[in-house]
């Protein structure tokens, strides 16, 4: 078995290392999915249908992986999805992930159940951001969170 991230070469390797290193409840929180896990299954099935067949040593001098998501240009076709309680997994929590998203020129998703505030993250990084609202019974709290996200998260100009 591996004891180092340097020995991880695919998603399965990272998952096995996380399972070995993390306390069981934290691993299962990260490894699981919401509700009945239908979206998790659909995403997994979709990824299994993809074959990455590289065109080896052909046209690698000008590789451009950039894309546009919701009007925001990203340097890579991936983004850091909103995940609640990230300090459970790492001492920097959302702050560390937001910095990594900025470093790699991609979007960072802020969860309303995060361990860092919308203001803190928005003041720290200029990378494109989105906000995931967990709807609460308290409509006043929902309104306040939406207003904060409108103030602190850049919204691209819509073409319509």
Question: Each PLM stretch: what is its role?
Answer:
Residues 76-78, 97-106:
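A short, Lys/Arg-enriched amphipathic alpha-helix followed by its capping loop at the start of a domain
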Residues 2-74:
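An N-cap/entry alpha-helix motif that binds or orients negatively charged groups
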Residues 23, 80, 101, 159:
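Conserved, mostly hydrophobic/aromatic
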Residues 78-81, 106-110, 129-133:
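Hydrophobic faces of well-ordered beta-strands that scaffold small-molecule active sites
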Residues 82-91, 131-139:
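Active-site mouth loops of central-metabolism enzymes
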Residues 91, 110-126, 138-144:
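Active-site-adjacent beta->alpha loops and helix N-cap segments on the catalytic face
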Residues 101, 121, 148-149:
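Generic structural signal for hydrophobic
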Residues 151-160:
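Single conserved hydrophobic/aromatic residue that forms the stacking wall/gate
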């Amino acid at each position: 078995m591996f004891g180092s991230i340097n020995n991880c070469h695919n998603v399965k390797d990272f998952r096995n290392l996380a399972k070995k290193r993390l306390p069981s409840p934290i691993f299962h929180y990260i490894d699981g999915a919401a509700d009945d896990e239908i979206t998790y299954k659909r995403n997994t099935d979709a990824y299994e249908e993809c074959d990455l067949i590289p065109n080896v040593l052909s046209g690698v001098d000008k590789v451009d992986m950039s894309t546009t998501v919701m009007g925001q240009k990203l340097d890579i076709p991936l983004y850091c999805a909103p995940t609640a309680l990230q300090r459970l997994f790492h001492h920097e929590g959302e702050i560390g992930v937001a910095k990594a998203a900025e470093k790699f020129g991609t979007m960072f998703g802020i969860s309303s159940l995060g361990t860092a505030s919308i203001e803190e993250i928005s003041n720290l990084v200029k990378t494109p951001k989105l906000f995931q609202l967990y709807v609460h019974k308290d409509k006043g709290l929902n309104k306040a969170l939406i207003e904060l996200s409108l103030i602190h998260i850049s919204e691209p100009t819509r073409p319509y």
